[in-house]
Curated annotation (Swiss-Prot):
InterPro entries: AB_hydrolase_fold, FSH-like_dom, LovG. It comes from Penicillium citrinum. This is Esterase mlcF. Its EC number is 3.1.2.-. It catalyses: dihydro-ML-236C-[compactin nonaketide synthase] + H2O = holo-[compactin nonaketide synthase] + dihydro-ML-236C carboxylate + H(+). The lineage of its organism: Eukaryota, Fungi, Dikarya, Ascomycota, Pezizomycotina.
Length: 251
C-alpha cells in the first residue's frame, strides 16, 4: 500500500504551492518536521506538498536518533545490489525513471484537488535535492510535460555524484550549456556536511551563478537550526521570491 499523501493545506486560501522532496532513508512526515521553521515562515505565501520516494530503506543520514520509531523510511534510488534482477543492474536512466512515477502522482493529485494553488517551486533535501535537479534538467531538455514550470527552488545539502553528472551530460549530448538549469535557486550548505563538496560541485555544474544564491551555515547534513541561520535562510528565500515575482515568472 502506498503511503498517504501529506500536505499542509488551508482550505479557502488560494495560494501557490511548493513541492517537497525528502532525502534518502526519510519520509514525507519526517521532512515536514525537518523544514518546520521554513513552513512557519512561509505559511502566508505557500502550501507545502510532499512526495514520497518509491523504495523502502533503512534510516538515512541524520534521521536517527531524532526520528527513531517514525518509520517506514523511503529512498529514491535503490542500491546496485538491491536492484539486481536476473543479474541485470539498472542504469541511471532506469533509476531516474523509477522516481518519476511517485512525483508525477503527487503533482497530478494536487493539481486536480487544488487547482487554485498551483505548484510553482521545490524544496528538496539531500538525495531529494538531486532528484529535484534531475527533474528540472529533464524538463529543460523538453521531457516531463506533466511537470509544473518551476519558478524557484530551495536545495538543501544536496547529495551529488559523478554518476548523476555523467548521466545529465550524456542527456545533454556533451553540450555544457544544456547542463545549466535556468531556475532561480537558493542552496543551503552545511559547513560540516559530509556532502558539502558535492553540493558545491552541483551548483557550479548545473546552475547559473546569477540565479544561484548559496548560503553556507554552521551545521552538518540538516536544515539550518541556529536562529540566525534560519532567519538568514528565510530572508534569502523572500528576496529571491520577490525577485521572481518582479520578473513576472509566477503565473
Amino acid at each position: 500500500m502506498s503511503p498517504a499523501r501529506i500536505t499542509d493545506f488551508s482550505p479557502g486560501k488560494p495560494r501557490k504551492a511548493l513541492l517537497c522532496i525528502h532525502g534518502a532513508g526519510c519520509s514525507a512526515a519526517i521532512f515536514r518536521v525537518q523544514i518546520s521553521k521554513l513552513r512557519v515562515a512561509l505559511k502566508n505565501e505557500f502550501e507545502f506538498v510532499y512526495a514520497t520516494a518509491p523504495f523502502s530503506s533503512s534510516p538515512g543520514p541524520g534521521v536517527l536518533p531524532v526520528f527513531q520509531g517514525m518509520g517506514p523510511y523511503y529512498t529514491w534510488f535503490q542500491k546496485h545490489h538491491d536492484a539486481v534482477t536476473n543479474t541485470t543492474t539498472p542504469t541511471v536512466g532506469d533509476r531516474v525513471a523509477a522516481v518519476i512515477g511517485p512525483v508525477q502522482k503527487t503533482v497530478q493529485d494536487w493539481s486536480i484537488t487544488n487547482p487554485q494553488a498551483p505548484i510553482v517551486g521545490i524544496v528538496a533535501f539531500s538525495e531529494g535535492a538531486l532528484v529535484a535537479t534531475l527533474l528540472l534538467h529533464q524538463q529543460q531538455m523538453g521531457k516531463l510535460p506533466w511537470f509544473p514550470k518551476m519558478s524557484i527552488a530551495v536545495l538543501i545539502c544536496c547529495f551529488y555524484s559523478d554518476e548523476a553528472r555523467d548521466y545529465m551530460r550524456a542527456e545533454a549530448q556533451d553540450d555544457d550549456d544544456k547542463l545549466i538549469i535556468n531556475v532561480p535557486t537558493l542552496h543551503l550548505h552545511g559547513r560540516q556536511d559530509f556532502a558539502l563538496q558535492g553540493s558545491r560541485q552541483m551548483v557550479e555544474t548545473h546552475y547559473l551563478p546569477q540565479n544561484a544564491d548559496v548560503l553556507e551555515f554552521q551545521g552538518k547534513h540538516n536544515f539550518p537550526n541556529r536562529p540566525s541561520d534560519v532567519q538568514e535562510t528565510v530572508k534569502r528565500f523572500q528576496q529571491l521570491y520577490q525577485k521572481v515575482k518582479m520578473s513576472g515568472s509566477f503565473v
